[in-house]
């Protein structure tokens, strides 16, 4: 599928289907829209009336045009109120148009959406993202991968003729999101710690990064008892992945992104019970998947920022070697942990990963993890929790997320809640009381950071979509690759 920006007015465009964005107050035919309606013998006005189209955000309508017309179909998509228009408005409108074009088996599509803040490049980029992400369908495991194959061949973004670079960048960004989606979608018999590490090596080779894989013996030498405690029950070897992107000149900043990478989590000896969706625990590496997706994009966009991408990859399984509830582990910073729940394993793997990241002497560390069900209870499926020791860093991430159209809500690091993690026989337990579970999880991770500005993203809700939602189809969403990339590019 070829996506391009052109300066052709929608009045002069020809092709299979012309898609128009309409505001709530714009359903009265005037100006150029009136001219188009006249050219199409009243088709637009007729569609508005018959579909009772009011321009509300997310609504859409389509109709055929007479056989002598230079276009075959007209599509309308609602934009909501004009004063509420944002980049994400056109991004999601473009996604709705793309899905409709697929349903209608359109081959050539013209899209006319309003330019946001007089910035044609950013608008074209958002439109391209919307198209690519809404149309992504993961058919790799179907016997006929071409079933319901896309017919769309060419998309023209009208009124954005100088946007080639922005569209190319959107395609690069979307490829990282799609990589993360497909990693999350992959079952645990295809994505293992070994194949996850191989994916990281492939990214390094194709995107200009370096890749270091620490094997179990290397991790033992570094004292990673917390990570290895989780890993020892699995028959598959753990892989500690360290990807590095360095710019050609002196970097403006040095950053670290750390992703939780449990390729499968059965809960360990605290086995997940019925109703705990054990079959969905292939997605417990969603943080690592987004980390690799961001690494792929950053390597191709080549910002003047040094970035370290870290994933401690393993499974949490059951065997005679498994950690027991009550065991004590020693992390690589010397702190001891009483394991009172083997199903709170992600934070144990992240503990050593955070210590490793801080030793790189970076300016900021961001970790992301499908860490707690408590965060889903608090914020639902579409919003990630954000905790940070540094408000400047938190504000940077929130700004990056707003540009991406991904949602975060800053949560408190309530130090008093650490009382619930105290152990009589170790420095801390790995879980606290049920109340405030996402906060105590963040406080646990904080024990493995000394002075570096740090943020924790609990992405347990938004990493997976149970139904079509915005630009997401059912399955992995690739959240929050776009936020991470925007954050890195902001320096």
UniProtKB/Swiss-Prot annotation:
- EC top class named in words: hydrolase
Keyword Chloroplast found: no
Pfam families (alphabetical) = Peptidase_M17, Peptidase_M17_N
Q: Which SUPFAM superfamilies match?
A: Macro domain-like, Zn-dependent exopeptidases
Q: Which CDD domains match?
A: Peptidase_M17 (cd00433)
Q: What cofactor is this protein dependent on?
A: Mn(2+)
The active site is formed by 272, 347
What is the free-text note on the cofactor? Binds 2 manganese ions per subunit.
Specify the protein name: Probable cytosol aminopeptidase
Q: What is the lineage of its organism?
A: Bacteria, Bacillati, Cyanobacteriota, Cyanophyceae, Oscillatoriophycideae
């Amino acid at each position: 599928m070829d996506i391009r920006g052109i300066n052709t007015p929608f009045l002069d465009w020809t092709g299979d289907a012309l898609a128009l964005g309409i505001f709530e107050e714009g359903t009265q035919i005037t100006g150029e829209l009136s001219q188009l309606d006249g050219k199409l013998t009243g088709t637009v006005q007729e569609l508005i009336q018959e579909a009772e189209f009011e321009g509300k955000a997310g609504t859409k309508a389509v109709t055929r045009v007479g056989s002598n017309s230079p276009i075959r179909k007209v599509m309308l998509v609602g934009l909501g109120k004009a004063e509420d228009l944002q980049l994400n408005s056109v991004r999601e409108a473009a996604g709705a148009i793309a899905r409709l074009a697929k349903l209608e088996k359109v081959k050539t599509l013209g899209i006319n959406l309003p330019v946001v803040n007089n910035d044609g490049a950013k608008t074209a980029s958002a439109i391209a993202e919307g198209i690519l992400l809404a149309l992504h369908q993961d058919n790799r495991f179907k016997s006929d991968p071409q079933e319901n194959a896309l017919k769309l061949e060419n998309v023209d973004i009208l009124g954005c003729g100088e946007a080639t670079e922005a569209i190319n960048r959107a395609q690069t960004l979307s490829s990282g999101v799609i990589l993360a989606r497909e990693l999350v979608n992959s079952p645990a018999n295809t994505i293992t710690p070994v194949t996850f590490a191989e994916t990281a090596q492939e990214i390094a080779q194709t995107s200009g990064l370096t890749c270091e894989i620490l094997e179990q013996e290397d991790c033992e030498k570094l004292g990673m008892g917390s990570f290895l405690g989780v890993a020892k029950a699995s028959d598959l070897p753990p892989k500690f992945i360290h990807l590095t992107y360095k710019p050609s000149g002196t970097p403006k900043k040095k950053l670290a992104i750390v992703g939780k990478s449990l390729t499968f989590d059965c809960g360990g000896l605290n086995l997940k019970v019925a109703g705990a969706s054990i079959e969905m625990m292939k997605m417990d590496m969603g943080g690592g998947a987004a980390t690799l997706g961001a690494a792929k994009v950053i390597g191709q966009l080549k910002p003047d920022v040094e970035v370290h991408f870290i994933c401690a990859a393993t499974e949490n399984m059951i065997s005679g070697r498994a950690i027991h509830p009550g065991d004590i582990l020693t992390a690589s910073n010397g702190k001891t942990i009483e394991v009172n729940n083997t199903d709170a394993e992600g934070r144990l793997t992240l503990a050593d990963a955070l210590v490793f990241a801080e030793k790189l002497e970076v300016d900021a560390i961001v970790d992301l993890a499908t860490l707690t069900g408590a965060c889903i209870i608090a914020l639902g499926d579409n919003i990630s929790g954000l905790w940070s020791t540094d408000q400047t860093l938190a504000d940077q991430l929130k700004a990056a997320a707003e540009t991406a159209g991904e949602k975060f809500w800053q949560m408190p690091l309530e130090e008093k809640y650490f009382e619930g993690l105290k152990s009589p026989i170790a420095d801390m337990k790995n879980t606290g009381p049920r109340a405030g579970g996402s906060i105590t999880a963040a406080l646990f991770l904080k024990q493995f950071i000394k002075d570096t500005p740090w943020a924790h993203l609990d992405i347990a809700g938004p990493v997976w979509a149970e139904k079509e939602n915005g630009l997401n189809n059912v399955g992995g969403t690739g959240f929050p690759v776009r936020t991470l990339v925007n954050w890195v590019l902001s320096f």
